[in-house]
């Protein structure tokens, strides 16, 4: 009986083990066809962005905080390389457009930041929500979309190595 419990415990630990940042998993399902407002107040239709090429959609808890800044700047620093491969990048958080604009301008981010104060995009991507007092925050996550399909997802996304993770996955999915 003890042996069965130990084996069952080991099996469950393996199956339910926590993901480490940057590992993610290969998947294949339709990408959410949502829309949101960017830092300039313009509506961004995600399905239209997906048609332009591979798309990285990353979620971060709060604009202009240390971990979120590392994640966003990692993608900023690799943006020229990613763009050569036709990759589009969208960042999403619960922040309002004015906070997204300040974050984008402060760190010269070359891609749109989408305001999702009601959490509709967060919900569509099944990103975990965290509560900090009265604030709702999106758990750091990242998705790679190709041809309208999510092909990779990472619900434990890296901060400063986000771009490296994306480049690795892009190379594996060519």
Describe the role of every protein-language-model region.
Residues 1-7:
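Bacterial N-terminal signal peptides that target proteins for export
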Residues 7-15:
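Bacterial N-terminal signal peptides
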Residues 20-47:
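N-terminal "domain-start" segment that seeds a small globular fold
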Residues 46-69:
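Short active-site neighborhood of thiol/selenol oxidoreductases, capturing the structured segment around
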Residues 69-108:
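Structural microenvironment flanking redox-active thiols in thiol-disulfide oxidoreductases
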Residues 90, 104-139:
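Short, internal strand/loop/helix patches
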Residues 137-174:
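Thiol-/selenol-based redox modules, centered on thioredoxin-like
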């Amino acid at each position: 009986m003890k042996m069965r419990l130990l084996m069952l415990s080991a099996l469950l630990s393996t199956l339910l083990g926590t993901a480490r940042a940057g590992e993610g998993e290969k998947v294949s399902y339709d990408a959410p066809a949502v829309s949101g407002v960017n830092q300039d107040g313009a509506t961004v239709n995600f399905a239209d962005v997906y048609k332009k090429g591979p798309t990285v959609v990353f979620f971060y808890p709060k604009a202009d905080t240390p971990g979120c800044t590392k994640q966003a700047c990692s993608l900023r620093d690799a943006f020229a390389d990613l763009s050569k491969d036709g990759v589009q990048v969208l960042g999403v958080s619960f922040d309002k457009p004015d906070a997204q604009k300040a974050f984008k301008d402060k760190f010269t981010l070359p891609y749109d930041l989408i305001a999702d104060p009601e959490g509709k995009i967060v919900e569509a991507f099944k990103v975990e929500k965290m509560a900090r007092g009265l604030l709702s925050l999106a758990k750091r996550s990242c998705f790679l979309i190709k041809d309208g399909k999510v092909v990779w997802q990472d619900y434990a996304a890296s901060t400063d190595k986000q771009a490296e993770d994306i480049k690795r996955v892009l190379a594996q999915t060519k």
